[in-house]
A protein has these predicted regions:
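OB-fold nucleic-acid-binding modules
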Residues: 1-7
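OB-fold single-stranded nucleic acid-binding module
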Residues: 13-24, 36-39, 45-89
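Short, acidic/hydrophobic/Gly-rich beta-strand patch recurrent on exposed beta strands
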Residues: 26-31
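Acidic/His-rich, divalent-metal-binding segments that scaffold phosphate/diphosphate chemistry
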Residues: 85-201
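Histidine/acidic-rich helix-loop-helix segments that form or flank divalent-metal centers
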Residues: 174-177, 187, 192, 200-205, ...
Length: 278
């Protein structure tokens, strides 16, 4: 149930087209008082009455008027007021900081062939890698989110590798961690004016997922273990993993990447507001 007294943070926003051809907006709002989530929608007429920037992830809104839809467990927004606008993503200084950290981790790869391959991929796509999000709603859904998520995973990897009692290949860990979400630069678009994040329609016609992109890239270049780690980093087939970690005799590196990816996605700086709370 929505409240006109409480403030709401925009968690995610996307637009869709109905079967009749009408445009509609979908929002996930977080009640800043209770922490509860609210699924919302706006019909095209109401959507057009608001600035596109109103629904930027991280924005703080007040619901002025809406209708609760108990049968669908959502509410139809009619009018909202923007209370505080969130920034779009990383600023130049933050981007430079995370980019330099990424380069420092790539330099830790001792195998020259593997290091040069990773560096080539990241350098070739650096403009996109610096601004693309890591997700639409789940985590790091802001400009520069992919860069932040990747560096966080590398930090978790560095901290935890020495704790593994079994033998693991550090070069493969650093390489797979750096490249595991590279495919997201082709999978997502972000509007640098409004912050709206959308899927690239043509991506899924060429690749099933960003995991498949990374897997194919590394496998065709001769880095089989790195490819396998990327294939398994979602953990379970029903979560999008190409290799399900429920299978027997899985190499420890495959579990490792999945676990550190999950830690960043749940406990890292998953939204831009967290950068202003330091």
């Amino acid at each position: 149930m929505f409240s006109t007294d409480n403030l709401y943070e925009v968690v995610s926003f996307s637009t869709d087209t109905t079967k009749t051809g009408n445009k509609m907006g979908r929002l996930l709002l977080k009640d800043t008082t209770t922490g509860s989530m609210l699924n919302c929608m706006l019909w095209e007429e109401r959507l057009n009455q608001h600035s596109p920037k109103t629904f930027k992830p991280g924005n703080i809104l007040r619901i002025i008027s809406a209708t609760q839809n108990p049968n669908y467990n959502n509410c139809t927004l009619e009018n909202v007021k923007l209370i505080k606008e969130a920034r779009l993503g990383l600023n130049e200084e933050e981007t430079a900081f995370y980019w330099n950290k990424l380069q420092s981790y790539i330099s830790k790869i001792k195998d020259e062939k593997l290091k040069n391959f990773v560096l080539e991929q990241i350098t070739k796509h650096q403009d996109s890698f610096k601004i693309k999000p890591a997700g639409i709603s789940m985590h790091h859904n802001f400009a520069g989110g992919l860069l932040v998520h990747t560096v966080e995973c590398l930090e978790f990897a560095e901290l935890n590798m020495s704790k593994f009692a079994c033998e693991i290949n550090e070069d493969n860990i650093y390489a797979a961690t750096t490249l595991h979400d590279l495919g997201k630069i082709f999978e997502y678009n972000i509007d640098l004016e409004t912050g709206a994040i959308t899927y690239v329609d043509t991506f899924k016609t060429d690749f099933i997922s960003h995991s498949q992109y990374g897997y194919c890239l590394c496998l065709t270049n001769g880095f089989k273990m790195v490819a396998r780690m990327i294939a398994a980093h979602h953990g379970r087939a029903d979560w999008g993993a190409i290799i399900d970690l429920g299978e027997r005799d899985i190499e420890p590196e495959l579990y490792f990447l999945h676990l550190i990816d999950n830690m960043s996605a749940k406990y890292g700086k998953i939204n831009i507001k967290m950068f202003d709370e330091e």
